[in-house]
A protein has these predicted regions:
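Domain-level signature for soluble enzymes in the chorismate/prephenate branch of the shikimate pathway
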Residues: 1-94
Length: 94
């Protein structure tokens, strides 16, 4: 019985440590998203000057293909996130 209790405490420690790693990653992701959104807004201003369409299907396809190569194991999940990211970026560019 004692071994089971120690194992449970150890598992909790592992989960807590892993969550702390995720929290640190999230902090970085948030900072990078802020930068990405600022760049998207700047791109939108340049597109307005040139009277270009906000949506750039070729660029989005290029990014999705790059994701497929860089992260084949999580390609579907990352592609879903990027689909939403594209929508948000287009909103900032409009």
């Amino acid at each position: 019985m004692i071994d089971n209790v120690n194992h449970t405490a150890s598992s909790r420690d592992v989960v807590e440590r892993l969550r702390m790693e995720i929290d640190a990653i999230d902090d970085n992701v948030i900072r990078l998203l802020e930068k990405r959104f600022a760049l998207s807004r700047a791109i939108g201003e340049e597109k307005k000057k040139e009277k270009r369409e906000v949506k750039d299907g070729k660029r989005e396809t290029f990014i999705l293909e790059k994701i497929e190569k860089l992260a084949p194991e999580y390609n579907g999940e990352i592609a879903l996130l990027y689909a939403r990211l594209f929508e948000l970026s287009r909103g900032l560019q409009a």
